[in-house]
Regions:
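A SIS-like phosphosugar-recognition module
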Residues: 1-208
């Protein structure tokens, strides 16, 4: 996994802006959150092995970017980090996809899949990937007469191994730190979390 992380570190530091994956993702997110005022981002992995990334990305981005003050304490005007949610893509088609397709709000969306399956059933995997691609098209082609729309991106990994997983996680980490710069916030502290800890210690003292 460290090899994959290192390769993404090098890519993020040395690749020109027009081909820099983390920067492009950060710029798209900034545009969606600030210019388009899209309040949430939905991560939809179409691979059982990537299911846990939903909660991981949620913690990464919301703890890092869920702030309304700059490092100097001044209040930031406008939006910052989005609310992150999601679920396994195939399962979620029977729960919240209806809301994504026809609800009275909108979300930016990442659909992620692996081209090579992690099992022997290649025929079933082809059906899954075809379904993911079809859903990506369906989610982005909402009725143009409606005032709500989704901003949809797809991420395809050739095969999932430790190196690819490390690179994928590092990609989202770099995206998050770049967003901190764009929003003008420090992504490495969590004052809201610390306040909760402080209040819990006070409440515990009262109980004792």
């Amino acid at each position: 996994r460290q090899i994959g992380i290192r390769s993404m570190d090098v890519h993020g530091a040395a690749t020109p802006a027009e081909d820099n994956m983390a920067l492009l993702m950060a710029l798209m997110t900034y545009y969606n959150a600030v210019t388009q005022a899209i309040p949430t981002h939905c991560f939809l992995p179409y691979d059982e092995r990537l299911r846990v990334l939903v909660s991981w990305i949620q913690q990464l981005e919301m703890e890092s970017l869920g702030k309304n003050r700059a490092p100097d304490g001044s209040r930031i005007k406008g939006r910052t980090g989005q609310g992150i949610w999601g679920g396994h893509g195939n399962e979620s088609q029977h729960s919240f996809y209806q809301w994504l397709r026809e609800g009275t709000s909108c979300s930016s969306i990442d659909l992620c899949w692996c081209e090579k399956p992690g099992h022997r059933h290649a025929d079933l995997h082809r059906v899954l990937i075809a379904n993911a691609k079809a859903q990506a098209e369906a989610l982005v082609t909402r009725d143009p007469a409606e005032p709500y729309f989704n901003a949809v991106s797809t991420l395809a990994v050739d095969e999932l191994n430790a190196g690819r997983l490390g690179a994928l996680m590092a990609l989202y980490e770099h995206k998050t730190t770049m967003l901190g710069t764009l929003f003008g916030i420090n992504p490495f502290d969590q004052p809201g979390v610390e306040l909760g800890k402080k209040l819990s210690r006070s409440a515990e003292a009262d109980i004792l």
